[in-house]
């Protein structure tokens, strides 16, 4: 494998097709020594999200904080629904579990694992505990 620095062909720019992270592309190498190429074609995308612009995702990890800021479960549910709609496997990462004095982590974990989602618990500056 090698890295080739590429720009989109003028035709793609005229059609307002912009390559994004995750795109599968066909390229033409124009300078082997300088590792330069041109993107000739962008293959059909399996999925696409606008913010941040990415394509062909297979999974996405939603990181939520148990405290500071408090987890917004409605927002998390909306993000999960959007991921499912786009055919992207959501994974939930609950961070700052060391600050969970009310045992909220266990409740959140139970809710989401019961409906089939993978939940990872973390203390970002220490370790990851996989479920």
Give residue spans per PLM region.
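N-terminal accessory targeting/assembly segments
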Residues: 1-73
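Residue-level signal for inorganic ion chemistry
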Residues: 22, 83, 95
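Conserved nucleotide-binding/hydrolysis micro-motifs of P-loop NTPases
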Residues: 31-33, 66-69, 96-101, 125-128
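Conserved, well-folded catalytic cores of nucleic-acid-processing
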Residues: 45, 63, 67, 79-82, ...
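Conserved beta-strand/loop subsegment of P-loop NTPase cores
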Residues: 57-64, 86-97, 116-123
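Residues at alpha-helix caps and immediate loop-helix transition turns in enzyme cores, especially N-
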Residues: 72-75, 104-105
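Histidine-anchored nucleotide/phosphate-binding helix
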Residues: 74-87
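Canonical P-loop GTPase G-domain recognition
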Residues: 99-131
């Amino acid at each position: 494998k090698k890295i080739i620095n590429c720009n989109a062909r003028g035709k793609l720019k005229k059609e307002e097709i912009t390559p994004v992270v995750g795109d599968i592309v066909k390229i033409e190498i124009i300078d082997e020594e300088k590792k330069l190429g041109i993107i000739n074609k962008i293959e059909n995308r399996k999925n696409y999200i606008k913010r941040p612009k990415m394509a062909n995702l297979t999974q996405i990890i939603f990181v939520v904080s148990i405290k500071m800021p408090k987890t917004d479960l409605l927002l998390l549910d909306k993000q999960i629904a959007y991921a499912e709609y786009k055919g992207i496997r959501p994974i939930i990462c609950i961070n700052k579990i060391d600050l969970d004095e009310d045992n909220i982590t266990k409740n959140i974990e139970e809710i989401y694992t019961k409906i089939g989602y993978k939940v990872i618990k973390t203390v970002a500056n220490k370790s990851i505990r996989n479920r």
